[in-house]
């Protein structure tokens, strides 16, 4: 039997074997047996080297034709097997179109949204209005009008997400403070909840995207005593118990004097943990009396008007309330975590 006859014999055998395949796995095995690297057709072609030039041309051309025919037949057989499998499944399966649908599970508000609404209600009871502002801000509203100097570290690329047009993702809800000072005439009391962004290394207590509530009161004869009293009312109503706090000096360009309001870590009861960085205290609320330059920039006379401002971190507040040890859970989208609230 010469090579041409051997090719015909292999082709007939391949058609018979491939055509009798009962599954895609069986088809793949038969395919490899004939046109795989170690297949029968491949083995025959290795003997072509011993033929004359004319015979090489004839046998090579025939081998290519048979190989293409087999590829086409394999493809058709695969389609046929898939169709038979689908028909078998369709015949064996039954779907009752009259069966009542399963009741969809109820959704719920994100824990941060829940506490935001609760805080809004608390401040509404104290005469505060709720304001809003864009997440994409100008450099002026986010920094300049808040008394940040041109060389302030917060303006640098490693701390702030800048856009190509020079705008930025707001780094604090204090930017809404600027818009409010231009929009409203004092006296007024406002809070401004929203999402903020900072280019930070993410860990158990830091996220690049988080939530704040900015608060601001502008009027006459506003003092630090008014600020402290407001914060005490807020914390006692949020946690429904006395919370150990401490007020320490802090520097923020838009307030003078500035304070840091810390609360005893409720995750570890002040003993030290990754959330409070083993200190037992958690920075919750930077605050202070509004800087005269901020009032002047808004067209208000700081000799006539005074006020206080604060920025409350909602993520950390929720962590303290529920004893959550990692801020990253809030942005994870993990339903097992979120369904607990």
Curated annotation (Swiss-Prot):
It comes from the Bacteria. Gene3D superfamilies: Bira Bifunctional Protein, Domain 2 (3.30.930.10). One of its GO terms (biological process) is phenylalanyl-tRNA aminoacylation. GO terms for cellular component: cytoplasm. InterPro entries: aa-tRNA-synth_II, aa-tRNA-synth_II/BPL/LPL, Phe-tRNA-synth_IIc_asu, Phe-tRNA_ligase_II_N, Phe_tRNA_ligase_alpha1_bac, Phenylalanyl-tRNA_Synthase, tRNA-bd_arm. Its EC number is 6.1.1.20. It is an enzyme of class 6 (ligase). One of its GO terms (molecular function) is ATP binding. Keywords: Aminoacyl-tRNA synthetase, ATP-binding, Cytoplasm, Ligase, Magnesium, Metal-binding, Nucleotide-binding, Protein biosynthesis. Its main location: cytoplasm. Its cofactor is Mg(2+). Mg(2+) binds at residue 256. It is found in: Cytoplasm. It catalyses: tRNA(Phe) + L-phenylalanine + ATP = L-phenylalanyl-tRNA(Phe) + AMP + diphosphate + H(+). Binds 2 magnesium ions per tetramer. Tetramer of two alpha and two beta subunits. HAMAP family: Phe_tRNA_synth_alpha1. Belongs to the class-II aminoacyl-tRNA synthetase family. Phe-tRNA synthetase alpha subunit type 1 subfamily. This is Phenylalanine--tRNA ligase alpha subunit. It comes from Leptospira interrogans serogroup Icterohaemorrhagiae serovar Lai (strain 56601). The gene is pheS.
